[in-house]
């Protein structure tokens, strides 16, 4: 193709993504667009086509990114090249959304005609505005009995400040309004900027591991062009590779001779190691590099740490490989080896949040067939010892002896909670219950309020999101930055089963709530741990002091069943004999702890009601 032809082709490209709150119909709309543009034959069509992971279909959420090329013949007779980049909608995956938005010029904002604007919609719209995208509002599910498109239209204008007078009224399920959306993309989404003659600059927005071709990068070409045979350089680490193949997804991978400015596609270059490719990195040509990398990409810091252990310790190396492969597609997953007396060899992993943790756990179990145990999540504490030493501890079992601890600092976050006015009371009550300190409150408009609190990160990782969403009917949007470390009265609580410490059940708690939380966990474990042949005491202890105890009663055979009447001393003899047997069993017996016991330390629902 000549430079002139490439420039004309660039004018016809439209890169866009779909942003929406969970369940507002994003994946269904993507399916309809694929059908309307005849990208996928009706024989191959299936619901949530872009959500290729079983897990995504089951949970009805989008986790990974997918980028697809479609051809659309517009009413003006011209054929346009659309690149649809699918985005996740959950708060844990905000970074994935920001990556995919950086590869677009426009975004379709899908809002449910019955539910209206929700928290995550807002968060994603702000990300789109940060990337200077043209936003096309679409009011979806207009065929629902509870739909109120006019109210939602006003809401979009008042809350987000977008002109919604031309918002398309659609129903992705019934296929209403799809053509209008496609026409609006042609008219309103700008063609990609960028110079096809400039040095290559391409943004990596996702990567997938392929056993035969190595790491496959999903890229958006910002300037220049790339073709097989080129020598590319990754700008973050200076490593060079030879391009073996480039192409696009339709959703299947299709080879191409080149990818030019504005294109979204994949690139394979025999990249062997997972760690070389950083999502958000810039690809350029080794012999004619770009002057500066693309900006706006940050290293992700994990919020939540938890131990992951294979139930079968011989699977340790398989688990390491599995985590390395997951890390390739998920720049936000961190892990390092660790050992536990109770659980053996495993890994300490860092996650973005609790949904992220859940998803990784399920993917390890499903895709790699590894049965595993996961411990309760925690954050990184600074522990100052009486010798003047500072330790960084993210695992409660590594906490030093309480007598040697001088002080403990924990991370606080500056939490910005945007919420409709009627829920301000509920948000303030929740934040205070979670040991938050009020900072300030601003009114954004007549209805929305921005509340700022300083809250310990440890309180947020438990169930702050869920509590916030339920106490505000899902309207609160929440964003946080780690602000500082502060001294806190924290203690390490150990759980003892049958007199033995279970290191994987230890956790850190504020002194004020230690008694209640200890009591709650002991009661929970009593319900979860199966009864044994002998009595099992469960104790919660701080140092040497036992703060709560509960006993699991022994299973016992009725040894008196064959004594019909008869002498009481005969019965007593049988009972004494049974008692001696149980005592002997107790001294040598060990207690199996089921996976739910580790997770029960997680969900502190009841203890929130008590606080």
Swiss-Prot record:
Record's bilayer topology term: Peripheral membrane protein
Function per UniProt? Required for accurate and efficient protein synthesis under certain stress conditions. May act as a fidelity factor of the translation reaction, by catalyzing a one-codon backward translocation of tRNAs on improperly translocated ribosomes. Back-translocation proceeds from a post-translocation (POST) complex to a pre-translocation (PRE) complex, thus giving elongation factor G a second chance to translocate the tRNAs correctly. Binds to ribosomes in a GTP-dependent manner.
Annotated GO biological processes are: positive regulation of translation
* Entry's EC annotation: 3.6.5.n1
What's one Pfam family here?
GTP_EFTU
Subcellular location per UniProt equals: Cell membrane
What's the protein name?
Elongation factor 4
Catalytic activity of the protein: GTP + H2O = GDP + phosphate + H(+)
Q: Which GO terms describe its molecular function?
A: GTP binding; GTPase activity; ribosome binding; translation elongation factor activity
Principal place of residence: membrane
- List the taxonomic lineage: Bacteria, Bacillati, Bacillota, Bacilli, Lactobacillales
The entry's family comment says: Belongs to the TRAFAC class translation factor GTPase superfamily. Classic translation factor GTPase family. LepA subfamily.
Ligand binding (GTP): 23-28, 140-143
InterPro entries named in the record: EF-4, EFG_II, EFG_III/V, EFG_V-like, EFTu-like_2, G_TR_CS, LepA_C_sf, LepA_CTD
- What keywords are assigned to this protein? Cell membrane, GTP-binding, Hydrolase, Membrane, Nucleotide-binding, Protein biosynthesis
PANTHER family attached to this UniProt entry: TRANSLATION FACTOR GUF1 HOMOLOG, CHLOROPLASTIC, TRANSLATION FACTOR GUF1-RELATED
Q: Does the keyword Phosphoprotein apply?
A: no
Assigned GO CC terms: plasma membrane
Top EC category? hydrolase
GTP-binding as UniProt keyword: yes
Give the tr-type G domain ranges: 11-193
